[in-house]
Swiss-Prot record:
The gene is xseB. Bidirectionally degrades single-stranded DNA into large acid-insoluble oligonucleotides, which are then degraded further into small acid-soluble oligonucleotides. It is found in: Cytoplasm. It comes from Corynebacterium diphtheriae (strain ATCC 700971 / NCTC 13129 / Biotype gravis). Coiled coil: none annotated. Gene3D superfamilies: Exonuclease VII, small subunit (1.10.287.1040). This is Exodeoxyribonuclease 7 small subunit. One of its GO terms (molecular function) is exodeoxyribonuclease VII activity. InterPro entries: Exonuc_VII_S, Exonuc_VII_ssu_sf. It catalyses: Exonucleolytic cleavage in either 5'- to 3'- or 3'- to 5'-direction to yield nucleoside 5'-phosphates. GO terms for cellular component: cytosol; exodeoxyribonuclease VII complex. Belongs to the XseB family.
Length: 85
């Protein structure tokens, strides 16, 4: 029975490096990882590999969101300083 595969290649080369993914790419892949895990059709080792990938993707998404929040706060700070002068 074939399994759903994410990424390109085989084995550990199947996934693009997480640090190279945009927020949207990481989010979309995370959604797909969750979908595949919820099917429950893989063995333990394969499931763990997908779970680990999902954790890394979630962390990457959080990094992107934190960076966006910092940019917004900086822009708002610059805007409010401009109004005070």
């Amino acid at each position: 029975m074939p399994h759903d595969i994410i990424g390109q290649g085989t084995g550990t080369n199947a996934f693009a490096p997480v640090e190279e993914l945009s927020y949207e790419q990481a989010r979309d892949e995370l959604v797909e990882v969750v979908r595949i895990l919820e099917l429950g059709q893989m063995g333990l080792d394969e499931s763990l590999a997908y779970w680990e990938r999902g954790e890394a993707l979630a962390k990457r998404c959080e990094e992107h969101l934190n960076g966006a929040q910092q940019r917004i706060e900086k822009a708002l700070g610059e805007t409010s300083q401009g109004h005070e002068q």
